Swiss-Prot record:
SUPFAM superfamilies documented for this protein: Recombination protein RecR (SSF111304)
Keyword set includes Metal-binding: yes
Record family assignment: Belongs to the RecR family.
InterPro entries: DNA_Rcmb_RecR, Rcmb_RecR, Rcmb_RecR_Znf, TOPRIM_dom, TOPRIM_RecR
Keywords annotated in UniProt: DNA damage, DNA recombination, DNA repair, Metal-binding, Zinc, Zinc-finger
Zinc finger map (C4-type): 57-72
One Gene Ontology term of the molecular function aspect: zinc ion binding
Cross-referenced PANTHER family: RECOMBINATION PROTEIN RECR (PTHR30446:SF0)
Gene it is expressed from: recR
Span of domain Toprim: 81-176
Name of the protein: Recombination protein RecR
GO biological process, one term: DNA repair
Organism domain of life: Bacteria
Organism from which the protein derives: Shewanella sediminis (strain HAW-EB3)
SMART domains attached to this UniProt entry: TOPRIM
Amino acid sequence: MKFSPLVDELIQSLKCLPGVGPKSAQRMAFQLLERDRKAGQTLAQALASAMSDVGHCRSCRTFTEESHCPICASNKRGQSEQICVVETPADVLAIEAGGHFSGRYFVLLGHLSPLDGVGPEELGLSLLEEHLCSGGVSELILATNPTVEGDATAHFIADMAKVHNVSVSRIAHGVPVGGELEYVDSTTLALSFNGRLPI
């Protein structure tokens, strides 16, 4: 059976979300149309507003409605000499939730992936280099994902920072707190052993 063009368009549009296949998109569309049209209208308005009004911070590239995000606009944090480099704005939220970092961020919006056409320019590394040249950065903390692409990106940025005599560190990877060793993969265990600390 074929749906009306508008229903079909809604279902197809919902499939653009990560992890949403045809069945999930259909369930979402039917939920909004059958049971919660007001929520659907609120969702549509919020989505339209976000798509037109949310851009990227001119300094760190995270999402913001202003020219600078609240962290970069902050008198205290905006002047920090530590910059944590992450792949996505979601990574910023995860680190902020921990409350252990009080410096600035730089959001790559991805990682190096030559096969996908993602090089240094697509990651905004020229802007990061401007920060490094300014003399206001003493340390880069690399918090890219522990993947082949994330590691390659971290090495590329580390080489860039060393040219400017900026200290570079990488967040530790290993066994999660509360995790059981029998469920940890061998690569993570190897990282844990190699990164062990004295007590």
